[in-house]
């Protein structure tokens, strides 16, 4: 997936509207960009006042087979009555192409922001995650990757080594902190967990609330442990996180089994996300949208803070993992 140098500068509004017109959709409103840096996503209304979202995928990030697997997973979830935003089919195809771009069209789904501190909402999310994972366990992804150390740690480490935008005065300390963190994660990482198809990026921003949860954006769907779709929902101090996790697991287990031994993967997964996110920003720096929206990435203070964050996360990895109350 060598997509580092790509930009969306050739994706003009006329190109988008032509692509939609090819599918029989006439745009009757403007194209409203939605918050997405990795892809380009727009909301619009057609002549019949129906609202849609069109998503143009970043070329070469995912293969055609990988995107189709994501779409198939979404459609399976809908069939199993799991509330997800799934792509629409045109002439039997959900993945469409126009002028070198692949794209998909979704119904526009409104909703309020999921309230991460609302225990009732957290319980409902836990129940539906159990159902989502029931579907995910039916078979693994064939083309999409597994969550693992190579993609999330070792490849990003090389990105840091090669990155010219990390200030020279901070690079040595940052790389040292990175290496220490990588060693700590490697020591406590496990591969004996049950693998299933995951949402992959299940945080509060990817859940809408409409008399219940609605999961959106399966772009990061992968194979991995169930805990990956739970830990990003936790917030606050350890006591608050314990209560939230117990709420999620209790609701989850109404419909699906959960291996509580996976709780020990929360902090390694958090460390992997920290490392991967920084490498992602560096890889995308050639896209003009990134320097514009992340101007602080070249600053000394920013990298000093990241070094401190990595050191603190290493300390957390050496502490006992989050513990549930004895009933679990």
From Swiss-Prot:
Protein name, entry field: Stress response kinase A
Feature type site, description ATP: 36
Function statement: A protein kinase that phosphorylates Ser and Thr residues. Probably acts to suppress the effects of stress linked to accumulation of reactive oxygen species. Probably involved in the extracytoplasmic stress response.
InterPro entries reported in the protein's UniProt record: Aminoglycoside_PTrfase, Kinase-like_dom_sf, SrkA/RdoA
PANTHER family registered for this protein in UniProt: STRESS RESPONSE KINASE A (PTHR39573:SF1)
Coiled coil stretches, renumbered: none
Gene behind the chain: srkA
Keywords: ATP-binding, Cytoplasm, Kinase, Magnesium, Metal-binding, Nucleotide-binding, Phosphoprotein, Serine/threonine-protein kinase, Stress response, Transferase
Quaternary assembly: Monomer.
Spans traversing the lipid bilayer: none
Protein location: Cytoplasm
